[in-house]
Regions:
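Short Gly/Ser/Thr- and charged-rich N-terminal loops/segments
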Residues: 4, 12-14, 25, 30-32, ...
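Glycine-rich phosphate/pyrophosphate-binding loop regions near the starts of catalytic domains
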Residues: 10, 77-241
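N-terminal amphipathic/basic leader segments beginning at the initiator methionine
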Residues: 57-88
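Short, low-complexity intrinsically disordered segments enriched in A/P/G/S/L with frequent Arg
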Residues: 9, 18-20, 33-35, 40-41
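Serine residues within intrinsically disordered or low-complexity segments
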Residues: 13, 19-20, 28, 40, ...
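Glycine-/charge-enriched secondary-structure boundary and capping motifs
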Residues: 57-65, 172-187, 203-210, 262, ...
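Acidic, glycine-rich loop-and-beta core segments that form the ion-binding/anion-interacting portion
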Residues: 231-271, 275
């Protein structure tokens, strides 16, 4: 132990202190300046530092910046939230090295196929930190993952979260997990595991980041690949709650530039700017299940996230098909009009960055439009007929 300390202190002294102006000269007891061996002085200082460390007592993990007790408290506080998400297929409880989920309930499927997705909330986490509001950002993390796997037709089974933080504040961590649990309840996924990683020195104490991982199941024969898409199919858009979880770097830049306060109330928003921006991402899982239960076969689905319409709608298309979206077929939400106005953002850039009021776009056969719209409304969501599929080069046209 002594050798390790001396070696490390000596290394630090030589590298950090030997070049310091402090050791260019030092005075003898008679007051005259004498040139010294800089490395020798540094080594002597190392010994003094060693004595100081030994006198101060032994080091532990908490002194290094990681509070294990805070971690235990976080787990205790989040247990009640996690319990709300449990499904019969979950095996075991909280605290193990892994989460287990039985697949025996899916024996009726010819070929059960797992579908996975991982995502985060982007820089929307920064907004939550600024507003000191942490109970909804977890919904965003779940939504970003389960909406993605729902585009393949999968039913979400379970979810895992990862929280990185500069310092573990148990109440804040539990608040974040309460949002994750709420997102799991909305999507039907069980929260079977997670990690809270305390990163002293890597992240500021008051900052954190959040990511998630979702796994779902579908019978392989029902997997959505876009191959069933046909010219003549109708595009149905499902309303978003607002900005959702993409484009927040641009959002922050706009309102930093205009020096807008998040507490500013806007009549057109019906709330403050901050509350409009932090509105959690809508989870479409139950509405999509309702459509399936109505006997409708969706031909393709697109989750409108980063990249807006221009990047995401083509992802659901097969070669030889082209999507046409009519911009006046649904109302653009006021938050996007405000963003465009305040930031002087061109319309094409808006549609290439944000969801513009539609968080999910579906393609169905013309004869299934009415049943699809009814099933969506049944779950409290708002649908719009927004366009069509034509024959042509793979891509999207907004008209």
């Amino acid at each position: 132990m002594y050798r390790w300390l001396v070696g490390n202190l000596r290394l630090w002294s030589v590298q950090e202190l030997v070049s310091s102006e402090l050791f260019d000269n030092h005075k003898s007891i008679h007051g005259e300046a004498v040139t010294t061996n800089r490395e020798s002085v540094a080594i002597h200082l190392s010994i003094y530092l060693l004595v100081y460390v030994l006198a101060a007592g032994t080091m532990d993990y908490k002194n290094a910046g990681v509070d294990i007790e805070a971690g235990y408290k976080s787990v205790e506080l989040m247990k009640k939230h996690i319990a709300k998400t449990m499904r019969p297929e979950v095996l075991g409880g909280i605290g193990g090295f892994s989460g287990a989920f039985s697949m025996s309930a899916f024996k009726n499927m010819e070929e059960p196929t797992l579908v996975s997705g991982t995502d985060g909330c982007g820089t929307k986490v920064k907004l939550a930190m600024i507003m000191d509001k942490h109970d909804t950002i977890g919904i965003d993390a779940v939504a970003m993952c389960v909406n993605d796997i729902a585009c393949a037709g999968a039913e979400p089974l379970f979810f895992l979260d990862y929280i990185a933080c500069g310092k573990n504040y148990p109440e804040k961590i539990a608040e974040i997990v309460s949002g994750v649990a709420e997102g799991c309840v909305q999507s039907g996924a069980a929260l079977i595991g997670g990690e809270t990683a305390e990163h002293p020195g890597l992240m500021p104490e008051d900052e954190h980041d959040l990511a998630g991982f979702a796994v779902g199941v579908i019978d392989k024969q029902d997997l959505l690949t876009g191959e069933e898409l046909n010219p003549g199919d109708v595009l149905i858009g499902m309303a978003s709650t607002g900005v959702h979880s993409n484009g927040f770097s641009l959002v922050r830049k706009v309102f930093e530039m205009t020096r807008e306060s998040l507490d500013t109330y806007y009549d057109e928003l019906g709330t403050t700017l901050g509350e409009a921006l932090i509105a959690p991402t809508r989870i479409y899982v139950k509405a999509l299940k309702s459509i399936r239960d109505a006997g409708v076969r969706i031909h393709a689905r697109s989750h409108i996230t980063g990249g807006g319409f221009y990047e995401n709608i083509p992802r659901m298309l097969k070669e030889g098909t082209h999507a046409v979206v009519e911009r006046d077929s649904y109302p653009v939400l006021p938050i996007f009009k405000l963003l465009a106005k305040k930031g002087n953002i061109e319309e094409k850039m808006m549609y290439n960055t944000f969801n513009m009021g539609l968080g999910m776009v579906l393609a169905v056969a013309p004869e299934d439009v009415d049943k699809t719209m009814e099933a969506i409304r049944k779950e409290g969501d708002t649908p719009y007929v927004v366009g069509r599929i034509e024959a042509g080069e793979k891509g999207v046209t907004l008209c």
